[in-house]
């Protein structure tokens, strides 16, 4: 995690498929839950290569603003920027664009975790 620095950026592009959409009138459009998934995935990809063995990360907060429709079959691109590091808490600002305009923005927080402790807790819940 020592190599993570404020200002780092990472982008990811998806083609909007049926599984990413909701119905609006006669149109299938990129859904807010799918936009949230793209935000989390892009931030995760930025941070993951910088973690130490035995560390993982989990999303803990997403504040999202979905600003415009993107039809199925079109591309959406998210660009995440790491804007703050507070011990194990990572804060990202993410902008989402389609081929025409900005269609979303988000603030996303992730926590770096100890995977052994995480899996122990999970196993207890599974019985």
Residue ranges of predicted features:
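Catalytic strand-loop segment that frames the active site of acyl-thioester-processing enzymes
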Residues: 1-30
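Short beta-strand edge segments in extracellular beta-sheet folds
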Residues: 15, 97, 109-113
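A short mixed-secondary-structure module that forms the rim of ligand-binding clefts
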Residues: 32-34
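Hydrophobic beta-strand-centered segment that forms part of the acyl-chain substrate-binding groove
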Residues: 45-77
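Hydrophobic beta-sheet segments that form the core/acyl-binding groove
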Residues: 64-99
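C-terminal output/interaction extensions
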Residues: 109-127
């Amino acid at each position: 995690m020592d190599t993570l620095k404020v200002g780092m950026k990472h982008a990811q592009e998806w083609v909007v498929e049926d599984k990413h959409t909701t119905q609006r009138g006669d149109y299938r459009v990129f859904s807010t839950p799918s936009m949230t998934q793209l935000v989390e995935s892009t931030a995760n990809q930025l941070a993951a290569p910088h973690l130490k063995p035995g560390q993982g990360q989990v999303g803990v907060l997403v504040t999202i603003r979905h600003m415009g429709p993107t039809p199925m079959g079109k591309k959406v691109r998210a660009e995440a920027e790491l804007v703050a590091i507070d011990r194990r808490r990572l804060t990202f600002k993410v902008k989402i664009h389609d081929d025409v305009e900005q269609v979303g923005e988000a603030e996303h927080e992730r926590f770096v975790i100890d995977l052994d402790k995480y899996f122990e807790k999970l196993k207890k819940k599974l019985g």
